[in-house]
Amino acid sequence: SWWQGKELDYGITHSEAKVFIGDDERLQRLEGLVEDIPRISVRCDASAYTNSVAFEEVVEPNEAFPLVEIDPEDDASIMYTSGSTGYPKGVVTTHRSIINTPVAWAFLGSMASQLETDGGETFVQPESPCTLAAVPLFHVTGSHSNFLLSLVTGTRIVLMYKWDPVKAIELIEKYKVTSFSGVPTMAQDILKASEDNPERDLSSLVSLGGGGAARPPEQIKAQEKNHPSKIAGV
C-alpha cells in the first residue's frame, strides 16, 4: 500500500476490516491508529507493534480452517480508488468476477497457441513459466492477473519494489521471465531498455501483455520488428 497512516485508518474503518497484514513500513504508519484491530506482521519484529503477531506464527500448522459455503456472487474483495477528488471509494468485487480473470487468461493462452506468426511459428507455453510483477498488488492487475493467475497455474513470480525498466530487463534475464503485464508505457520502457542494453538476453520473454490504455500502433510495429516471436497483448 502507498497509503499513509490517515488513509490506512480510513480504509480499515470504512471497510470494517477484521485484521491488518503489513510489513515494518506499514505497521509504523499505523501506530497509534485503530489500535483495536489485530495486526499480522510480515518480515519484522511483531513485539515492536501494538496488538501484533508474527506471520510465521499465524501460518504454523494448527486446526483446519472451517469450511465455508461461498456463493459465486458473494463479495470477495474491496479495491479502493485513488481518491483524487476526495476520500478513496471502495469498489467491491465478487468471487465470480475475480475467478473470471484466470479463466479469461486461460482462454487467451489457448487461442494464442493456435496462432501463427508471419514466419509460420506457433506460440508454445513455457515449461517453466515465470512472470515479472511490476505493478502494485493492491491493483487488480497485480492481485488478479499476476498473483491469482500465478497461484492457479503454479507460475513463479518475480517482484519489483518500484518500476525501473533497466532493472526490469536485468530481472527478466536473471530469472528467465516468460511473461510481463503492465500499462503500454511500461512495455515501451522494456522495448527501449532492451534496445539501449543489447547485451541483455530477453529470449525467455514470450508474452508482453498490458491494459489500462490503448497500445500505440508504433509500439506493436517496433515489437514485431525487434521481437517477432513474442506475443503483444492488449
Task: Tell me the role of every PLM-derived stretch.
Residues 76-105, 112:
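Conserved AMP-binding A3 loop
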Residues 14-16, 174-175:
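Active-site charged/polar residues at nucleotide-handling catalytic sites that mediate phosphoryl
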Residues 99-130, 138-178, 193:
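Conserved AMP-binding/adenylation subdomain of ANL enzymes
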Residues 83, 152, 177-182, 192-234:
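Gly/Ser/Thr-rich phosphate-binding loop
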Residues 25-72, 99, 194:
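ANL superfamily adenylate-forming
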Residues 62-80, 87, 117, 121-130:
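Conserved pre-ATP/AMP-binding loop-to-beta segment of ANL
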Residues 1, 134-139:
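Conserved AMP-binding
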